[in-house]
């Protein structure tokens, strides 16, 4: 059985282990009735099971002080403290929020070289959640999604090491199927405040740590779309648009599309996945360090849409796209609702244009932040932010300086707000030190090959 090696946390090349690769964040439902109920009542898809709530918790100032072996099945954690998930530990009474701009948060406390991590003070948050697999999920492949954990996450299930992930601002997902048992399961996680990747998370903001976004279990049907790419781009005359959909699927069967505008059907078509597939790849493309899984098929579809109503911040016209997947027997497997906006972005003579007209950005840099809960922002607070922006003629947001939780992207489509999504990659503290000392080997990531894979992974994870 593979074991977790904490010494690797200071290696820039160790940023994921057995973690699923990035994929689109679309929600899928069992059938149309479940989808309609969810849209009307705000209920969750039955393919997901939330683990939000109280978890057992232990805080340590550093790894040496953390409880060793707590992840084992026979280690009892019931007398530990309770902590809310999602939440920053600093907003729950452990450690303290720290604001820093260019300086790294450990400067003046411990001298370390880029890539290394503090040892005397580097808080470790140990979490435990006991759960039983819901009846309707039994017998299915089971996955877990941590939508945000800052900044390094190690995971165990029933004493077995599942995997590891860094990047504080994009999801970390793992398959749990091979580690499950009947009855109660023990899920254990350790979150490290600083890892080698923290050298590239030197943003101008408050420094927190912990599991601060949603956590949920999920299953997939036998025929499943795990990744979607939708491009809706008008031709230059804007009278006709190309609707291109790329979908990567597991399993065989068929796929159906229906595009509507204001209740009127614009497009309806059904295709065989086996006939439409134009690229077959081993599931290693979907996993990191995981083999023995089924094949995946990528399908591409393109349609011409006449006289499209165009999306802009001033007039955010959206179409309703419904995608249905069926197995080979014709049984519906999942239904995926998506909002689609047709718009044409171009650079003309050095000027950015949308739908043939010059864009005038009246925008703001927006941190994902609540005065009450830090970077765990409620839907109510987020909607309030966006309403105030629109009321004050703000039409653009830059997510400084990292990807936000998924909801804001959907809401910007609906509200009519241009979105500039920033990668979680900032290391200006190393530049200042190098400028002062004239030791430019201190700069990261620079041209150092050991940082390359981590950088590319962060760009690829920005779904």
What are these regions (language model features)?
Residues 2-20, 25, 41-42, 56-62, ...:
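Accessory beta-strand-rich segments of carbohydrate-active enzymes
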Residues 50, 124-132, 141-143, 171, ...:
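Intrinsic-disorder/low-complexity, polar/charged segments enriched in Ser/Thr/Lys/Arg/Asp/Glu/Gln
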Residues 66-85:
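Short Gly/aromatic-enriched secondary-structure transition segments
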Residues 90-133, 137-145, 150-157, 163-166, ...:
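Active-site-adjacent substrate/metal-binding segments within catalytic domains
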Residues 178-184, 246-348:
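Extended acidic/polar, glycine-enriched regions
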Residues 222-251:
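Surface beta-strand/loop "capping" patches
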């Amino acid at each position: 059985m593979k074991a977790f090696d904490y010494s690797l946390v200071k290696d820039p090349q160790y940023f994921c282990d057995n973690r699923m690769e990035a994929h689109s964040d679309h929600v899928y439902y069992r059938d149309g009735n479940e989808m309609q109920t969810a849209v009307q009542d705000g209920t969750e898809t039955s393919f997901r099971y939330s683990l939000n709530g109280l978890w057992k918790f232990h805080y340590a100032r550093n790894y040496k002080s953390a409880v060793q072996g707590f992840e084992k099945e026979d280690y009892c954690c019931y007398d530990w403290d309770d902590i809310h998930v999602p939440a920053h530990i600093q907003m729950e009474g452990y450690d303290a929020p720290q604001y820093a701009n260019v300086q790294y948060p450990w400067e003046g406390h411990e001298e370390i070289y880029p890539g290394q991590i503090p040892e005397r003070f580097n808080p470790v948050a140990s979490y435990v959640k006991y759960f039983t697999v819901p009846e309707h999920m039994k017998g299915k492949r089971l996955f877990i999604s941590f939508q945000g954990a800052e900044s390094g996450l190690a995971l165990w299930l029933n004493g077995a090491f599942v995997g590891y992930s860094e990047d504080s601002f994009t999801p970390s997902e793992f398959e749990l199927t091979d580690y499950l048992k009947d009855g109660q399961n023990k899920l254990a996680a350790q979150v490290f405040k600083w890892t080698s990747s923290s050298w590239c998370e030197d943003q101008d903001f408050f420094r927190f740590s912990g599991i601060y976004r949603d956590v949920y279990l999920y299953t997939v049907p036998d025929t499943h779309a795990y990744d979607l790419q939708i491009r809706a781009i008008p031709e230059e005359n804007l009278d006709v648009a190309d609707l291109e959909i790329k979908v990567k699927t597991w399993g065989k069967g068929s796929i159906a599309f229906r595009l509507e505008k204001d209740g009127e059907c614009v497009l309806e078509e059904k295709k065989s996945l086996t006939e439409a597939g134009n690229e077959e790849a081993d599931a290693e493309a979907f996993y990191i360090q995981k083999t023995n899984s089924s094949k995946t098929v990528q399908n591409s579809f393109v349609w011409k849409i006449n006289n499209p109503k165009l999306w802009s911040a001033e007039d955010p016209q959206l179409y309703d796209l419904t995608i249905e997947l069926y197995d080979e027997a014709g049984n519906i497997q999942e239904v995926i609702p998506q909002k689609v906006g047709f718009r044409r972005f171009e650079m003309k003579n050095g000027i950015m244009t949308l739908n043939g007209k010059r864009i005038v950005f009246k925008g703001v840099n927006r941190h994902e932040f609540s005065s009450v809960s830090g970077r765990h922002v409620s839907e109510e607070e987020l909607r309030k932010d966006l309403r105030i922006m629109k009321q004050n003629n703000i039409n653009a947001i830059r997510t400084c300086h990292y990807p936000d939780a998924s909801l804001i992207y959907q809401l910007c489509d609906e509200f009519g707000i241009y979105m500039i999504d920033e990668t979680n990659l900032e290391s200006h503290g190393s530049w200042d030190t190098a400028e002062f000392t004239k030791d430019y080997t201190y700069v990261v990531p620079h041209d150092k090959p050991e940082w390359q894979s981590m950088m590319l992974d962060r760009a690829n994870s920005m779904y």
